[in-house]
């Protein structure tokens, strides 16, 4: 499976990175990591990219890492459609005190607009 993982620096997206790398290793998935700007994250994109590359260097997986400029949700959807990805993976989905799932604006846009399946990792 050809998987596009969006990582924006939130703790959820870094957790999604670990989980998606594990799955790619187990399933033989082709992984591309898109480092996106997330206005809700305190970590800048340089640091996010460094962490992504560090995580990938510790496993026997060749993955493409790219910096994606512009609106993160729109760009992830565009890339998935234009490059033939089978799935978009994203971190997100905190549970509220009332038991409802709260998702960020990037994940919401991707879930509502992606032409492929979306794997939301919590």
What are these regions (language model features)?
Residues 87-122:
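Gly/Ser-rich helix-loop-strand patches that form or flank binding pockets
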Residues 22-25, 81, 111-112:
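Solvent-exposed polar/charged
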Residues 32-34, 64-68, 119:
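General small-molecule cofactor/ligand-binding pocket signal
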Residues 24, 52-56, 80:
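Conserved hydrophobic residues forming the short capping helix/wall of the S-adenosyl-L-methionine
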Residues 17, 42-53, 104:
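Short, surface-exposed alpha-helical segments at coil->helix boundaries
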Residues 58-90, 95-98:
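Structural beta-alpha unit
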Residues 1-43:
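Small/aliphatic-rich secondary-structure junction motif
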């Amino acid at each position: 499976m050809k998987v596009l993982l969006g990582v924006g620096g939130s703790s959820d997206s870094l957790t999604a990175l670990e989980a998606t790398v594990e799955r790619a290793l187990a399933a033989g998935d082709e992984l591309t990591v898109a480092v996106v700007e997330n206005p809700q994250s305190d970590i800048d994109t340089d640091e996010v990219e460094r962490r992504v590359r560090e995580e990938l260097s510790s496993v026997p997986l060749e993955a493409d890492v790219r910096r994606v400029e512009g609106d993160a949700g729109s760009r992830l959807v565009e890339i998935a459609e234009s490059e033939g990805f089978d799935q978009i993976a994203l971190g997100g989905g905190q549970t509220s005190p009332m038991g409802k799932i709260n998702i960020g604006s990037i994940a919401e846009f991707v879930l509502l607009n992606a032409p492929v399946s979306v794997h939301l990792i919590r």
